[in-house]
Swiss-Prot record:
Cofactor: Zn(2+)
Result, substituting E235A: Reduces catalytic activity by 3 orders of magnitude
Keywords for this protein: Histidine metabolism, Hydrolase, Metal-binding, Zinc
Gene name for this UniProt entry: hutF
Protein's name in the database: Formimidoylglutamate deiminase
UniProt key word Hydrolase: yes
Classification via NCBIfam families: hutF, PRK09229.1-2, PRK09229.1-3, PRK09229.1-5
Enzyme Commission number(s): 3.5.3.13
Result when mutating E235 to D/Q: Reduces catalytic activity by 4 orders of magnitude
Organism: Pseudomonas aeruginosa (strain ATCC 15692 / DSM 22644 / CIP 104116 / JCM 14847 / LMG 12228 / 1C / PRS 101 / PAO1)
Lineage, uppermost ranks: Bacteria, Pseudomonadati, Pseudomonadota, Gammaproteobacteria, Pseudomonadales
Amino acid sequence: MSAIFAERALLPEGWARNVRFEISADGVLAEIRPDANADGAERLGGAVLPGMPNLHSHAFQRAMAGLAEVAGNPNDSFWTWRELMYRMVARLSPEQIEVIACQLYIEMLKAGYTAVAEFHYVHHDLDGRSYADPAELSLRISRAASAAGIGLTLLPVLYSHAGFGGQPASEGQRRFINGSEAYLELLQRLRAPLEAAGHSLGLCFHSLRAVTPQQIATVLAAGHDDLPVHIHIAEQQKEVDDCQAWSGRRPLQWLYENVAVDQRWCLVHATHADPAEVAAMARSGAVAGLCLSTEANLGDGIFPATDFLAQGGRLGIGSDSHVSLSVVEELRWLEYGQRLRDRKRNRLYRDDQPMIGRTLYDAALAGGAQALGQPIGSLAVGRRADLLVLDGNDPYLASAEGDALLNRWLFAGGDRQVRDVMVAGRWVVRDGRHAGEERSARAFVQVLGELLD
């Protein structure tokens, strides 16, 4: 058992002073005592917050972040960006994927993300053939997460088709493609090694355009009822139009009419949800997986978060393509997008919580923990000891009390104010540095040179 002491910490019931945390040998919060003494405990140097879950990641895309910002096509969109992504995928080796993921996860930790849901769809070799171990690339992701020290929910993706109605996959998708049987075998292969590594597993459909209704039914009936379920949905208007041409229904409308969507589900993006779909999402308890920096980068649109939150909807944040790795930026732009859409200020709040920063942080913690299916998201007994410490010497934060501190950090601060980060009771970032960052950066630079020559 170890102990840490915070002069102020955000607990489920609110801010508390002089908080002593007792942490078990397996990294779980065993006892939490406000108004306690620091005898024998490690004193922390700033306000303590729960670590933030990142509910949507494509690790390999970090290697191409910033490379698609070149004008030339007046109709540039997600679909043209995707062609660049396919060219990157066509070159990646297993070793390169592991290096990229490790570097990414270290950067996430330094920003205050303490767990990630990896939406992993690169399964096969350069020719589209299965590796000798079909789980080769999935296990590379697991090893990278372990090396970095971040919590992981691995989401191996079922990806079978190029478009609605079972259209044949394209050449650029050859590394992604599995049938339902191979996918279920992959899930079974991954359970034991992920559990041994302390990681979690989830079900994942790439999108309604990449799987058939029968495949969804087959996977959901296969007995993995304990796992979260993720899917990309309604990210682009073209997807909505294509789904209507195929089925006569919008993507979310089709999903809710044909599948029992519940709290296990994370609906990634859901950008183009209409009012009826927003209401269905809120009623079901599913999490809206919002990736603000990526959605802006791709020109996707703005999710109706104000309406969704007002109906009790649950949401979380993800860095997706990793053009940004900032808890602050994702949450700030979640609010700012609604302001730009509505041309009004202070949009995302609860009747009992007028502080925007607190509303955003609480919502993303709860939604992220639900989407990852892990015991995280709050500083409570029985939860994993995932936390971050903000800079106690920063004048803006040191002068702010209670929820005003979150407003200061999220709307006027940045990642540099994250000083220390703990995952499962182990410090992975101290004074803004990760022990493996220099070694990882050298390997990452080498990989970038290989990919971009």
